[in-house]
Amino acid sequence: MTQHAPAFWSLSVTEMLQQLQTAPEGLTGHEARRRLALYGSNRLKPPKRSDVFTLLFAQFKSPLILILLLATGLSFFLRDPVDAFIILTIVVVSGLLGFWQERGATNAVQKLLAIVQIKASVLRDKDRIDIPVEEIVPGDIVLLSAGDVVPGDAAVQESKDLFVDEAMLTGEAFPVEKAVAVLPADTPLGQRTNALWMGTHVVSGAAKALVVGTGKETEFGKVSERLRLRPQETDFERGIRQFGFFLMEITLVLVVAIFAINVYLARPVLDSFLFSLALAVGLTPQLLPAIISINLAHGAKRMAQAKVIVKRLASIENFGSMNVICSDKTGTLTEGIVRLQSALDVEGAPSDKVLFHAYLNAFYETGFTNPIDEAIRTHRSFDLSAYRKADEIPYDFLRKRLSILVAHQGTYLMVTKGALANVLSVCSTAETSAGAVVDIAAVRDRIERNFEAFSSQGFRTLGVAYRNLGTEPRISKESEAGMTFLGFLVLSDPPKANIIETIAALKRLGVSLKIITGDNHLVAANVSQQMGLSNTRILTGPDLRRLSDEALLGRVVDVDVFAEIEPNQKERIILALRKAGNVVGYMGDGINDASALHAADVGISVESGVDVCKEAADIVLLEKDLGVLVQGVREGRTTFANTLKYVFMATSANFGNMFSMAGLSLFLPFLPLLPKQILLTNLLTDFPEMTIATDRVDNEMIDYPRRWNIQAIRKFMITFGLVSSVFDYLTFGALLLILHASQDQFRTGWFLESVISASLIVLVIRSRKPFFKSRPSKYLLMATLIVVVATLLLPLTALGKILGLQPLPISFLLPIGIIVIAYIISAEIAKRVFYSKVKV
């Protein structure tokens, strides 16, 4: 048996079952597990490994760490095994801390993703069960219905009015009908009407299909492999990458220069090399990947408590930076409970005939469950025992109408409902209240006046039409012509009770709401006014079609409501908003929203949305409510703010200390700190920073969107690095010129000053307010105090002696304490000046 039977579309159902060694009732659980082990997970690319050994190795794969370990090994064999062992221990402990934190973050995220896992219905052991799509194997029998994503390349075994959207693979704009068939082996892909392709989705109808290919062996898998598709890089990821390159450039220049000068000054080569490498480790924020993972995972857990599930962690920063949110109105801004207010004839009088025809259409349609058809079916029921469904043309977003064909007393009747203009466009006649059929031109003005009157009151108004087809048992799109207009369906969906407060809350957070709807502009204007959006600026789909990309760019920011919008225009609107410099979120849950979700900086769907949307989304809301989004934005900004804190910490005190040490090493007759002491300094100062994810964030950091600003980070690094260096050199002067410290006393004194000042400065940098006005989290405070106390006690212990530290008299500790206090005060002043001049 091989995966993906050759030209499976040319085989009969029986031949395919034999080829894949399966049965119409599906595989057994045992056989499915065997095939999963044989063919692998049903993914386009293997999942990022997060097992224990992979994560552990990741902590030590930095080139700097690997070189340091190599140099330590040389030191072990050549000169000083004790020092080498100490350095090795510090590196391992640092790596284990990062591993422990990142492992916890990974596990937490996997649990959250399981909440919104995409599943497929399959037959296993003759029972219908839902399993994750990753577990689908060749030979599985899958059961599909409207809204489902096809989980693998498959052959149709049974179908009922099955229409599939293949645009993402073939570019075909209209849904394609699929049915059981045997086709020639050389049939082009777009004409294989018995084949289903992974990644496409069902628009209407239902099917039972045999999976013949999964993962990379699918048609879509081959395309994505050739193109090497990867998620679009976010601003946050780009910023982190640029920041990493920036630090590496500084580190490389500084370390090479220090090593060369120390060798020139005739100092031991190995000592100089280890010192330079230790400086490099101190300059480089080794824990940055772990801290980011911890921060994002912690933020994802907090967002989950707010009923917001993050599928792609890097999107959290974009979520916090978002300043425009685009959304449909139905169910998000409105109650989502559509009610049929009335069924009216051409004159606007109540009509049971219009209601009955609408009921026929809604009862027999097999597309994705929608609130309009549900409203029609529940408004009033009719006895349809004398009717039989014969055919269907499903709704699509270009025709904007749905037609069904029913058999009744030996004749066939086609009933169409949909957007009024689109229904009118296929009508040549209309039926009056008296039952007379007249030319459509005679009543068109009256129809349009009624439509405008209903729309201006906020009612969504559809048209209903019919056509007698005699003995014709099938229909196609061409059949939608020469129809008779019957009347109107008037529907309501009022705004949510709390929507005005929710929109105001978003506005206070600096997020503007733009409504994108297929409803006509009159309905959209009325609803937007009910939601408190006064002086609404509206752009319609037809107007949008006439605008060039440049013209749209000039208008898109000022428009509040986009009405009468076609699905392909949603993506164009999103891209224009992004090009105008906005961070754009798009909230959608319908079959036609997938491309817009992909185009947005943050794609947001809801748990109740169709699979194709949940698959495309970065973030999934467990409730379809903008109020949930408000809390999610706050949590996203909290996560970004805490990540930025670590970056600021890593580029201030640590950078200043290492820069000072590099400079001083050129003038001292001995190394200012031993390599093991530098690494210990780095380890101790990293400890409080590991708790940053739990820290509180001031309201002013949440109140408006912020974006990654590498220039501001560089300015921060220079400003606070210089402040740190000034006090480092004051420490040097006090130790050497006033206290006349010995070599070990100097190293101990500076070790104390470096670690304590770098730990305490965290409390200053974490907030824009004075540190005593912004309370840190208890974990950050405890970690800082533990490090300060441990640092003070370390020289008094046997371990301190091994590390080259010695107890200092009070005459040394007092000036060091004064310098640390002066440094904290100066940093507070520098912080105030910095934020008054630089926007971060």
Where are the regions that the model predicts?
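Hydrophobic alpha-helical transmembrane segments
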Residues: D83-Q117, R124, P231-V324, L489, ...
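Alpha-helical transmembrane segments of multi-pass membrane proteins
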Residues: A58-F77, V91-G95, F99, I118, ...
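Basic, amphipathic juxtamembrane/active-site segments
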Residues: F163, L169, V180, E335-H357, ...
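Helix-interface capping motifs at the ends of transmembrane segments in multi-pass membrane proteins
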Residues: L66-I86, F246-T284, A297, K301-K307, ...
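Cytosolic catalytic regions of ATP/NTP-dependent phosphoryl-transfer enzymes
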Residues: A195-V203, N318-F485, L491, A504, ...
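Membrane-embedded transport module
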Residues: L254, I258, M531, N535-Y586, ...
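Non-lumenal N-terminal regulatory segments of integral membrane proteins
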Residues: M1-R128, E134-V137, V142-V150, A155-F163, ...
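Soluble-to-membrane junctions at the N-terminal ends of transmembrane alpha-helices
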Residues: S41-G73, T106, R128-I129, D186-A195, ...
